[in-house]
Each structure stands twice: as structure tokens, then as C-alpha cells.
């Protein structure tokens, strides 16, 4: 809040309630925000000042394992020292202060003059977590590192009564990748994350039960942790208020939330791109992205999602081909696509708005002072309040998890259409691409897995914050459950990655199938045309035959017929191709009139020789076209290379995921693993942004 002084009075600025600042944070596009996050994530140094920390920086330190160096702004030292000195001076004066001379929480009526001993007892009784054997009950190192960074940042603002040297020690642990072991469970994030943060304090004070992880993953005690980190000053004897300053904050919940939201923002952009690629391989109608439709709805998330998809689809080679296909027999085809495609901007837009709002809420939280009491040196007083209540975390994470579940539901709906040959405009059932469909079930198992992922994701979407229990002798009778909600949202992010991986690999399989489809169709058309010219053009005496007019209509049959409906046995009489080719010749024969009675001009009599020659030639040509495709030398190039979605396809291929066929030993899951690991390592980020590098941030003009 801006404050100016005039005539000795403190006057509030123009935005005393901070609504204006909150609204200003949402200026600009979501994509630009994500680009900025990525840029911040990749910076080598995170400098903490107390007020400018970003979720991307938290993620960088959390995931970096010391690669992103943490520096503390020297400008913060004086303020931190002033509050620390104030506490000591108040103790010397005999001032009665909560957590300094009093007990804690519901037992704050107790009094003591042993301030240092009180802080030791605080850390000891809060060491109530359970680790068990193994690591399943230990907070992941990335989450702990995030919490450490956030706690330093909030304490740097100088309202907490803690020494600057303690904050430097935490930063050193981060930079040396020495990570205290914190319990996974046991906090209600009000009063802050007391139990887990007490284990950070335990390392700093050298408690014998404290453990830490080293860079190689081994577990060591506090003494070894300090030695490996190069902290030669020894363990800290906590001064009055310092233990409370360390544990009474929301850093664990907000730290995990920061990691979660960094990944969620990226996955939201991926969902937009996958929807556009889905439109391409499904031969959809891009009209659903027209700006006027979305302008009339007014919601910015929807407008941007549509504009992103519109940009990908503009000039797409697939969309040009789809337009020609839709122009054939338009009255026999659906006028519009199903909801999973047609309303994808309307579906994704609100989720992106929720994710953006949650991101800004958490960024406010990680830059807040959130312990109690707060030391106001300027007014010479300690303020007793409740900034440790992590409600912004619990609410933001519940909302984010709902948004993630909605994105996952859309992906599942789109994937279900993609693998279903009743809906996918000619792609084979299960996206199977082998020569024998009876021995190739492609993505059938993947669809079952997607149903499982989606179900679990929807179960996780249930809110955490409506399960509050009164705690600590009814002193903490309402509490945020912030870390619990953050942890559940982290689980949801992991599942959405599984779904995004499966869907992306499926879409790339569909891209390859469209490529194969074009080459097979080209081979069929050429073969039918050649056979028609040889058999149907001339009569027995060298004269032009009435059947020569069949060729054009025979080619139309091939254009209209789905290739994969007959590709495994193109001349089978039970498949539609041969049936419809014969029907063309029969129709011409019926229209041949009296000429049909003359054996020299009869079209009926050409059917047998036409079919026999076709049966001799077509299977060989189809197999040759398939072999050329598999050898990387197809007659027709893959049109994905002319599309803005190409970088995503290229990414999948470059990580080693290939074209799945029934003849290969490799399973779908093996291909998914390659892409999943790459996504988890952040390798999909640049290809995603490359898809949108030409976008100017605005929809196409309405004209």
C-alpha cells in the first residue's frame, strides 16, 4: 500500500485495498506471462529482496538442485537487524510478548523469562512428524527447497525478529544442495506450517534427530549437513522469537503451490496446442476459432485460447485438405464438430483464468509477511494477528486442481474421439497401423489408461478446504489446509502430465497415419487409373470403348472412401472399395443402353477383366507404398512440416518416440515413457513456444 506523509499524518495511497494492483497483475496475455516465467526460471541467480519473488524462481531453485544460485539483498540486512534488535530490547525492558515470554497458542497464558529455552522447546514439541522407513513419508526435496527459499524471502522483510545470519545459512544450504528432511504430513498451514518448518529449524539448531539429504541422495545428520554446506560458524542458539519466526509461516504450502503453478501454467498452454493439433488430424472445421464468436462471449481466457488455436490452424496444410474433403458430399457429413473440439476454447478459457488468478494469489503469498506477532519497529510495537492463516493457498490450490481436472477431462474426450473410428474421419480404430488389424490393437490399452487417469484426476478435484478440523485445543479452530491442498494439486499435475503425454503421442501417431493414408491413397488412385486405362479404354478391335468414361467416377470413389477401411486387403470383396468400384462400372453399364447388347461395346463384360487386373496389381502397389513410407522415402511428404504445430511433432520424434505398428515389439508404454520423461525435464517447453513464435498476441481481424 502506498503511504505518503502530509502535515504529520499518514495518508493512504490511491489503491489502499490493493484491488488495483491485483487487477494490474492480470494485464497482458497468458502466453506472454508463461514466456516470462520460462525466462525467469532459466536465470542463473535468484536474488531475494522480500517483495519480488516469482513462482518461476521458486521452481528454478526447487528443481535446480543448486544450479540456480540464491543471493540475499544486502539492502534487507538493516531492516532484519532492526526487528531482531527490537525483540532483544523488549525482553530487556521486561515487555510481555507472545512467543517470547509467553507460551504458545491455547497455552499462551503461561509465562517465562527463559526466552532461548522457550524457542528450543518450541522446535522440540513441533518435531511431531513421522518419517518411518524409506522416503514415502518425507517431503520431496524440491518441495523442501521451495519452502526454504520462500521462508527466507518472507523473513527478509524485517518484521519477524530473526538474525540475518540465520537466513544466510538457509541460503547456503540451498546453494550447496543440502536439503533438510521434512515430514510429508502433519501441517494444517495455520499457524503456518509449524511441524514441517520445525525440522528446518532443527537442522539449523543441530537437533540430534534432524536429518538432511546430500546432493547424491544420501541422508546425513545436522553436523554433517553443516560441514558439507561449509557453514563453519556452528549451529545457532536461537534468540527469543527466532524459533517462532522460522516455523510460524506458510512457506511449505506456498512453496509447493509455486512449483505446482509453474507447471500448471505450461500444461495449460500445451492443452491449447494439443486441441489445435487435434483439429488438424481430425480434419475438423477451424470456424470454431473465429474471433467474433469469442469476442461476443467477453471472457479473456476463452478469447486467448481461441486466438492461440486460430493462429496454429491459420494456413495449416491439414485445414486446406480438410476444406476440400468437407466440400465433397457436404449434406452427408455433420455440419459441425463435436463439443470436445468445437467448444475447447470455451472449456479451456475459464480454467486458464482460474490458473492465472491462483498464480497471482500465490505470488502475493510468497512475498507476504506471514508469521505472528509482527514487529513494527517504526511504531515500537508487536502486532498480534493471523497472517499465518494460509487460506489463499488452500483456496487457490483447490481451484487450480479443479481447473487441472477440467483440462484432463477435455483431453480424455478428445482422445476418445481420436481412437474411435466412428468419429475420427477415417483413421483406423485404436490408431492401429499394422498390416493386419486383427493383430494390432494400437492405443486400446492407452485409452483404458486414460480413463483411469481421468477418473483419478476427477477424484482429486474434490476440495480439501471443506475438511477443516479444529486443532490445538480449539485455538486453531479454523485452518487453511494449504499444504494438503498443494500436495493434492501436485498429484493432479503429475496425472495431467501422464494424460498430456499419452494424448500427444496419440496425436503424433495420427499425424503419421494421415501421412500413410495420403501415400496409400495416392498408390490406389494411380493403380486404379492405370488399370482403367489398360482395360476400359479400348475395345477388342482397338476402338474406343464406352467403359472409358468410368475412370473419373472410379477415382471419385477412392477420394470418398476411407483408406484404412480396406488397406489391409484392398481387393477383398467384403471391403467397400471393390464393392463401390464395381458399382460404378455397373451403373455405367446400365446407362449404356442398346450398346450393352453388343459384346464389343458391353461394359458389363469388362468388369471381370478389370477386377482381375486390379487384384493382380493393387496389393503389390499398396505394399510398395507402405514400404516406401516405412523406409522414409514416401512419394508424398508429411504435411505436418508445413504446419505451425510441427515443433511439437518434431519434439516427440526427437526424443525417440516412433510410429507404433503391430509388427514392432515396442509397446505404447515404452514410447510414452520417452515423451513423459522429456516433459518432466522441461524439454517440451521450447517446442511449445516455437509453435507460437509468430503469434502477435491478437486474434485474426474480423473481416
UniProtKB/Swiss-Prot annotation:
Coiled coil stretches, renumbered: none
Residue numbers annotated as active site: 98 (proton donor/acceptor)
Class of the enzyme per the UniProt entry, highest EC level: lyase
Chain positions of cross-link 5-imidazolinone (Ala-Gly): 190-192
Annotated EC: 4.3.1.24
Binding site for (E)-cinnamate: 248, 336, 342, 372, 444, 472, 475
PTM sites of type 2,3-didehydroalanine (Ser): 191
Localization per Swiss-Prot or TrEMBL: Cytoplasm
Pfam family, one: Lyase_aromatic
Catalysed transformations (reactions): L-phenylalanine = (E)-cinnamate + NH4(+)
SUPFAM superfamilies (alphabetical): L-aspartase-like
InterPro entries: Aromatic_Lyase, Fumarase/histidase_N, L-Aspartase-like, Phe/His_NH3-lyase_AS, Phe_NH3-lyase, Phe_NH3-lyase_shielding_dom_sf
Record PTM: Contains an active site 4-methylidene-imidazol-5-one (MIO), which is formed autocatalytically by cyclization and dehydration of residues Ala-Ser-Gly.
GO biological process: cinnamic acid biosynthetic process; L-phenylalanine catabolic process
Pathway given in the UniProt record: Phenylpropanoid metabolism; trans-cinnamate biosynthesis; trans-cinnamate from L-phenylalanine: step 1/1
GO molecular function terms listed in the Swiss-Prot or TrEMBL record: phenylalanine ammonia-lyase activity
Family to which this protein belongs: Belongs to the PAL/histidase family.
Function description: This is a key enzyme of plant metabolism catalyzing the first reaction in the biosynthesis from L-phenylalanine of a wide variety of natural products based on the phenylpropane skeleton.
Record-linked NCBIfam families: phe_am_lyase (TIGR01226)
Protein's recorded name: Phenylalanine ammonia-lyase
Amino acid at each position: 500500500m502506498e503511504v505518503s506523509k502530509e502535515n504529520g499524518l499518514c495518508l493512504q495511497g490511491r489503491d489502499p485495498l490493493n484491488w488495483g494492483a491485483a487487477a494490474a497483475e492480470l494485464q497482458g496475455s497468458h502466453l506472454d506471462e508463461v514466456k516470462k516465467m520460462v525466462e525467469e526460471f532459466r536465470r542463473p541467480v535468484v536474488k531475494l529482496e522480500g517483495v519480488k519473488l516469482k513462482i518461476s524462481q521458486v521452481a528454478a531453485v526447487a528443481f535446480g538442485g543448486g544450479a540456480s544460485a540464491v543471493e540475499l539483498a544486502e539492502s534487507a540486512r538493516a531492516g532484519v537487524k532492526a526487528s531482531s534488535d527490537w525483540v532483544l530490547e523488549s525482553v530487556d525492558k521486561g515487555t510481555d510478548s507472545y512467543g517470547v515470554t509467553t507460551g504458545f497458542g491455547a497455552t499462551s497464558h503461561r509465562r517465562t523469562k527463559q526466552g532461548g529455552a522457550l524457542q528450543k522447546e518450541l522446535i522440540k514439541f513441533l518435531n511431531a512428524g513421522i518419517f518411518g522407513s524409506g522416503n514415502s513419508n518425507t517431503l520431496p526435496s524440491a518441495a523442501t527447497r521451495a519452502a526454504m527459499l520462500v521462508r527466507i524471502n518472507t523473513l527478509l522483510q524485517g518484521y519477524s525478529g530473526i538474525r540475518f545470519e540465520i537466513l544466510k545459512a538457509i541460503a547456503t544450504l540451498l546453494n550447496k544442495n543440502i536439503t533438510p528432511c521434512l515430514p510429508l504430513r502433519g501441517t494444517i498451514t495455520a499457524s503456518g506450517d509449524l511441524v514441517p518448518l520445525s525440522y528446518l529449524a532443527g537442522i539449523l539448531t543441530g537437533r540430534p534427530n534432524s536429518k538432511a539429504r546430500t546432493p547424491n541422495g544420501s541422508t546425513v545428520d545436522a553436523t554433517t549437513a553443516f560441514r558439507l554446506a561449509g557453514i563453519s560458524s556452528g549451529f545457532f542458539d536461537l534468540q527469543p522469537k527466532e524459533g517462532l519466526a522460522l516455523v510460524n509461516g506458510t512457506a511449505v504450502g506456498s512453496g509447493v503451490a509455486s512449483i505446482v503453478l509453474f507447471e500448471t501454467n505450461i500444461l495449460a498452454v500445451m492443452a491449447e496446442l494439443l486441441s489445435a493439433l487435434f483439429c488438424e488430424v481430425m480434419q475438423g472445421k477451424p470456424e470454431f476459432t473465429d474471433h467474433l464468436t469469442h469476442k461476443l462471449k467477453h471472457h479473456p481466457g476463452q478469447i486467448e485460447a481461441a486466438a492461440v488455436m486460430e493462429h496454429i490452424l491459420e494456413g495449416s496444410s491439414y485445414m486446406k485438405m480438410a476444406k476440400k474433403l468437407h466440400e465433397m458430399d457436404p449434406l452427408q457429413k455433420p455440419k459441425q464438430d463435436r463439443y470436445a473440439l468445437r467448444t475447447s476454447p470455451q472449456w479451456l478459457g475459464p480454467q486458464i483464468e482460474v490458473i492465472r488468478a491462483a498464480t497471482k494469489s500465490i505470488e502475493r503469498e510468497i512475498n507476504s509477511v506471514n508469521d505472528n506477532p509482527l514487529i513494527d519497529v517504526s511504531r515500537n510495537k508487536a502486532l498480534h494477528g493471523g497472517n499465518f492463516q494460509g487460506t489463499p493457498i488452500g483456496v487457490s490450490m483447490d481451484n487450480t486442481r479443479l481447473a487441472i481436472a477440467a483440462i484432463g477431462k477435455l483431453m480424455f474426450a478428445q482422445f476418445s474421439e481420436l481412437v474411435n473410428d466412428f468419429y475420427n474421419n477415417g483413421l483406423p480404430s485404436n490408431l492401429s497401423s499394422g498390416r493386419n488389424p486383427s493383430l494390432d490393437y494400437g492405443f486400446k490399452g492407452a485409452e483404458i489408461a486414460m480413463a483411469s487417469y481421468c477418473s483419478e484426476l476427477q477424484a482429486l478435484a474434490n476440495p480439501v478446504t471443506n475438511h477443516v478440523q479444529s486443532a490445538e485445543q480449539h485455538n486453531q479452530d479454523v485452518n487453511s489446509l494449504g499444504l494438503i491442498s498443494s500436495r493434492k494439486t501436485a498429484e493432479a499435475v503429475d496425472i495431467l502430465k501422464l494424460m498430456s503425454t499419452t494424448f500427444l503421442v496419440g496425436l503424433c501417431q495420427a499425424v503419421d497415419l494421415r501421412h500413410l493414408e495420403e501415400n496409400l491413397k495416392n498408390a490406389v488412385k494411380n493403380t486404379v487409373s492405370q488399370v482403367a486405362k489398360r482395360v476400359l479404354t479400348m475395345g477388342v478391335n482397338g476402338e474406343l470403348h464406352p467403359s472409358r468414361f468410368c475412370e473419373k467416377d472410379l477415382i471419385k470413389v477412392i477420394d470418398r472412401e476411407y483408406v484404412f477401411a480396406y488397406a489391409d486387403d484392398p481387393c477383398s470383396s467384403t471391403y467397400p472399395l471393390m464393392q463401390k468400384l464395381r458399382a460404378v462400372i455397373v451403373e455405367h453399364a446400365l446407362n449404356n443402353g442398346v450398346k450393352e447388347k453388343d459384346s464389343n461395346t458391353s461394359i458389363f463384360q469388362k468388369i471381370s477383366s478389370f477386377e482381375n487386373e486390379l487384384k493382380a496389381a493393387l496389393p503389390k502397389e499398396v505394399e510398395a507404398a507402405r514400404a516406401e513410407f516405412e523406409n522414409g522415402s514416401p512419394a508424398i511428404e508429411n504435411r505436418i512440416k508445413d504446419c505451425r504445430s510441427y515443433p511439437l511433432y518434431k519434439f516427440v520424434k526427437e526424443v525417440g518416440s516412433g510410429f507404433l505398428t503391430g509388427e514392432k515389439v515396442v509397446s505404447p508404454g515404452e514410447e510414452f515413457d520417452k515423451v513423459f520423461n522429456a516433459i518432466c525435464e522441461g524439454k517440451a517447453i521450447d517446442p511449445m513456444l516455437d509453435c507460437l513464435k509468430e503469434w502477435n498476441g491478437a486474434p485474426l481481424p474480423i473481416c
